[in-house]
Amino acid sequence: MLGSLLLLAPLAGAAVIGSRSNNTEPCPGYKVSNVREGVNSLTADLSLAGKPCNTYGTDLKDLKLLVEYQTERPDERLHVMIYDANEQVYQVPESVVPRVEGRKGARPHSALKFTYEEEPFSFTVTRDDEVLFDTSASNLIFQSQYLNLRTWLPEDPYLYGLGEHTDSLRLPTTNYTRTIWNRDSYGVPQNSNLYGAHPVYYDHRGESGTHGVFLLNSNGMDIRIDKTEDGQQYLEYNTLGGVFDFYFFTGSTPKETSMEYSKIVGLPAMQSYWSFGLHQCRYGYRDVYQVAEVVYNYSKAGIPLETMWTDIDYMNARKVFTLDPERFPLPKMRELVDYLHKHDQKYIVMVDPAVSAVDNEAYEHGVDQGIFLQQQNGSLYKGAVWPGVTVYPDWFHPDIQEYWNSEFSAFFSADDGVDIDGLWIDMNEAANFCTWPCADPEQYAIDNDLPPAPPAVRPSNPRPLPGFPDSFQPSSSKRAVKRAGGSKGAKVGLPGRNLVDPPYKIQNAAGSISNKTINTDIIHAGEGYAEYDTHNLYGTMMSSASRGAMLNRRPDVRPLIITRSTFAGAGSHVGHWLGDNLSQWDQYRISISQIVAFASMFQVPMVGADVCGFGGNTTEELCARWAALGAFYTFYRNHNEIGSTSQEFYQWPTVADSARKAIEIRYKLLDYIYTAFHKQTETGEPFLQPMFYLYPEDENTFANDVQFFYGDALLVSPVLTEGSTSVDAYFPDDIFYDWYTGAPVRGHGAKKTLENIDVTHIPLHVRGGNIIPVRSSGAMTTKELRNKSFELIIAPGLDGTASGSLYLDDGDSLEQKGTAEIKFEYRRGKLSVKGSFGRSAAGVKVQAVKVLGQKAESRMSAFRSTEFELTRPMEISLQ
């Protein structure tokens, strides 16, 4: 049975030796020959140094080594690649992850240096004589379906990254395995592989600096962090294939190290101003009337709602690119969208990759174009998800973009479709409910009631919705009711591999690598890549195609796309929500380390968790705390699942109060957020940051994953436990100011207990040395907000100075015709304003300047004074 699922092409074209063996003796490693060194590069041949061990496949006899010094001081990057001599082994396609160019470094002058031992081959990367990476811990193994490499680490290292996971920000250092294999992972459990693949880690060494190590490899892998029996610390890669394609990068600070990573995987995409507003969604809104009622209720409660979302409920029998004709009929949907747009609000729906294989145009179009995944016998590959039996788009197919554009243009037409403003893509790991080998998806769908039965049809809305069209009112009102292994140099994978049951078993929480996903023996169209190698790319390729389709609809507008599955570099296309979390306090807490890791270390800065939790029933207290914490994510969305307690912010008085207060702060800060986010899209400098990014020599910050910096200026210290009204917040050796009172807090590198924190309140402190431009007040929509004047909050540092910046543009255009970039400096009691003042600053004024930590003197009659603040009304034009 198994044999029929394998690729059994001969191995004649590959430089391999023997077959799988039970030999448990150490593998021989490789020896170096034919070394050629240049000013900025090194190449060499590697040949097997002895008898093959064939532990989890066949040892490859001949390899190549490439070393490139890609950049110069102070921010340096070293590229080290070990690959097969014939270049048959799969490599991540450049069409998915474009390669960074560079041989600008010079080996004699580089702080990063590569050295090697000839036999058995090992290599070391050093930074100014400090060892960063040392593979002498074990011999290199490079087999047809297994790669192994181990590096020594310093004692008790501070390691971060290797996402996606819900473990601590600082990774455990003993008996810890990070499995990277994207999967549908409801409840986002700890110690488990989740939705995304980010094989990059950061090693922070305090005063000596920070460096990162990125392995550009999309195969499934286990990365182990542990100690040997004699206590030596190591990190070990165990991958199911691909090549060792390493990038070592460093900066003078942790922040600059993250910036260097952005040069490798790509800068994040800039988002529209409105995308930073509040978003509301739920799986289980029964019809368009209920969606409209939620919009109305937010307005009635005085809680600003920027964007309304609809989950899979809007579809006809859960089929993508369809509408339920009775519960979400097109005329009503168009009225809903028109209403939102007239009120300066936005609308987003969800699209899954899986297309129903039963009676729908998207399926017929895809079959006609041949763009769905196929079995090796040419038949369509089928799985089972929400609509029942499904097929899956092949993102490698040369015509896939044309197909995706066409479906988007028709269904989301502004003229006669659902005119969405953004997009949510889900289930794109890809998810498959059917257990491998899923021999009969049709029967599985029947046995599991897929698609599920929809709710009963309501002929009209049961309650009046003032301001909505007549068709949204109760019936009593005036209304009308209604392919195989590659050749030499192809880089698509060796022939003859077992693509569904590899000898080495990664610790995939779902079991078999084909379980609950697309079968890994599928061969993609085009170049002939195997799903075995490209599985972790599926979601990111959908992201890229979806961005293309949204730009095809509106070429001049930045598309907001939020995805579940990601790979390294996904931030250049999309934002990410953290998946199907639970309404639990531990998941509220762990979301902090998740958003910080994605934004600062993985360069996916548009990120947030489902506020109040997706699965299970939230509580009033948890939701109130989460409404406040979520206001300090970059992506701020309330979302929960069908059958759970309704958790829109207006459902409880305390939650509504918490949300109003938090959104007021967020909206005042929105241009500060927008400015810092824009900077990350230009330079890679992170917006959301762990504490050690700003205090890299303070060891007390290294493992702190319950506080974070919102930009450089704002420290967020949420209450962490149920029933508590206090939090032990750490303050580094610096000056901070209470956001609410302006009171100075002199940090001394110790924790301070903040007490009497109301459930509607979140502790915030402004870091000294910063100037924050804020809007004079909040607003119900971001469009209204943009008409508000500015105030400047000046928080003098220990030296009495402060600085800040403000970026302004039209908020939406992909290419800007006029921008303003303004710098503020405060020294010796004087404020200077400099910069480029484009037309985006027209009509924008600063109406007041607030200096924190100051008290008025009798001669300062022009200032309004509180105990710890001085505010000077004024008018500064930013034109």
UniProtKB/Swiss-Prot annotation:
Q: Which reaction does it catalyse?
A: Hydrolysis of terminal, non-reducing (1->4)-linked alpha-D-glucose residues with release of alpha-D-glucose; Hydrolysis of terminal, non-reducing beta-D-glucosyl residues with release of beta-D-glucose
Task: Show the SUPFAM superfamilies listed in the entry.
Answer: (Trans)glycosidases, Galactose mutarotase-like, Glycosyl hydrolase domain
Question: Its Gene Ontology biological processes?
Answer: cell wall organization; polysaccharide catabolic process
Write out the GO cellular component annotations.
extracellular region
Which is one GO molecular function term here? carbohydrate binding
Annotated EC: 3.2.1.20, 3.2.1.21
Task: Kindly indicate whether the keyword Hydrolase belongs to this entry.
Answer: yes
| Pro residues composition bias: residue spans | 451-467
InterPro entries of this UniProt entry?
A: Gal_mutarotase_sf_dom, Glyco_hydro_31_AS, Glyco_hydro_31_C, Glyco_hydro_31_N_dom, Glyco_hydro_31_TIM, Glyco_hydro_b, Glycoside_hydrolase_SF
The ranges of region (Disordered) come to 446-494
Question: Sites of glycosylation?
Answer: 22, 175, 297, 377, 515, 581, 617, 787
Q: Where in the cell is it found?
A: Secreted
Any single Pfam family the record assigns to this protein: Glyco_hydro_31_3rd
- Catalytic positions are 426, 429, 580
Purpose of the protein: Glucosidase involved in the degradation of cellulosic biomass. Has both alpha- and beta-glucosidase activity.
Identify its protein family: Belongs to the glycosyl hydrolase 31 family.
List the protein's name.
Answer: Probable alpha/beta-glucosidase agdC
Q: Which organism is it from?
A: Aspergillus terreus (strain NIH 2624 / FGSC A1156)
This protein's encoding gene:
agdC
